[in-house]
Amino acid sequence: MSNTQKQLALAKAAKKSVNTADTEEKNRALLAMADSLEAAAADILAANRQDLEAAAGKIPESMTDRLLLDGKRICAMADGIRAVAALPDPVGEILETSTLPNGLEIVKKRVAMGVIGIIYESRPNVTSDAAALALKSGSAVVLRSGKDAFQSARAIVAALKTGLAQTRIDPDALQLIEDTGREGSYEMMRAKDYLDLLIPRGGAGLIRAVVENAVVPVIETGTGIVHIYVDKDADLEKAIRIVRNAKTSRPSVCNSMEVLLVHEDIAADFLPKLERLLVRDRIEAGLPPVRFRLDPQAARHIGGEAAGADDFDTEFLDYILAVKTVASVEEAVGHIEAHGTHHSDGIVTENRHAADYFTTHIDSAAVYVNASTRFTDGGEFGLGCEMGISTQKLHARGPMGLKELTSYKYIVQGTGQVRE
């Protein structure tokens, strides 16, 4: 048995301590984990510095931001755990009840998933978010961090386990796979005897590898090739605010806009204003400018590189924005259907017909009208922290909170009935 299999077996053996814990016990564990995380801040920051030093010069600046921890972010992680503790416990919720003509009483009840596996990349905060959500939803959790964030993840898990050890929940219910090589991931993908669910969080390559190779049931958290379409009937000042926020507030995350579609009737007015805000004003403020990848029509109005064949199919996760002009809302929808990833897409318009057409025809987990796509987030949706953004339709779609991490079973109460 490999080390990874041993860790999977430990999690499976410990799951009963979580599955059978009541709400008070789970909340007590989460609060202890949050306190322990803050108490271990110095150790976590030291480990994070090791990760940052190892990654220096190897990853883009925007990705470094995802990897970076500081005291404020550790406090935010701890507060995120406390926020999960404050959420209603979904386990045990009665979803449906019915009584059959023969007198059988059927109850559909929400139950824990069992053991959840998470494979993720360079975001240390996923470690605490995933642990909190899994444990509150009644499941043990097995984490596999990317190499870039491994030292940070190890220090975070050590702190969380210290907190768990003060409660009745077995600390073995939280595991961090030590094998950061490819084989560690593939062992998790094949661990059908140990894992009830596997969730990948990361770039397109990771997600594709998990979806194509896993025998464990998977919820796909797709990449975010996020579009915003600025319609001819848009309020341009509103559009400017939305586009700036969607692209520059945090470009390294999956709900950040990657493609801007602009109606050709307003391109000559709108695009130069946007260029001034996203390029010249940012340079003057000492901030990274947005670099445009332009189709030929957009290039008539602003400066930038000519868009390549793949630019409208790329999740940049950087200060790069692909820009295309379109002749109608129908053309915008057609482009998104051809190039989108069903994550988050939005329209800016004051035309109700255009908005209704867009929301009806765009098949994404979150569709926005006159708002930034950056709101696709468990916390913003009132779910607490999230396990990821599901872009599939089965079991879960959009931000995955506690309910999305549970299953259900039927309890059938009889008085001696037999089937004829």
Curated annotation (Swiss-Prot):
Pathway assignment: Amino-acid biosynthesis; L-proline biosynthesis; L-glutamate 5-semialdehyde from L-glutamate: step 2/2
Source taxon at top rank: Bacteria
SUPFAM superfamilies, A to Z: ALDH-like (SSF53720)
EC number: 1.2.1.41
A Pfam family it matches: Aldedh
GTP-binding found in the keyword field: no
Keywords assigned: Amino-acid biosynthesis, Cytoplasm, NADP, Oxidoreductase, Proline biosynthesis
Keyword Amino-acid biosynthesis set for record: yes
Entry-linked InterPro entries: Ald_DH/histidinol_DH (IPR016161), Ald_DH_C (IPR016163), Ald_DH_N (IPR016162), Aldehyde_DH_dom (IPR015590), G-glutamylP_reductase_CS (IPR020593), Glu-5-SA_DH (IPR012134), GPR_dom (IPR000965)
Subcellular localization: Cytoplasm
A Gene Ontology cellular-component term: cytoplasm
Catalytic activity: L-glutamate 5-semialdehyde + phosphate + NADP(+) = L-glutamyl 5-phosphate + NADPH + H(+)
GO molecular function, one term: NADP binding
Top-tier EC class: oxidoreductase
GO BP annotation list: L-proline biosynthetic process
UniProt main location, coarse: cytoplasm
Family: Belongs to the gamma-glutamyl phosphate reductase family.
Biological role stated in the UniProt entry: Catalyzes the NADPH-dependent reduction of L-glutamate 5-phosphate into L-glutamate 5-semialdehyde and phosphate. The product spontaneously undergoes cyclization to form 1-pyrroline-5-carboxylate.
Descriptive protein name: Gamma-glutamyl phosphate reductase
Organism listed in the record: Neisseria meningitidis serogroup C / serotype 2a (strain ATCC 700532 / DSM 15464 / FAM18)
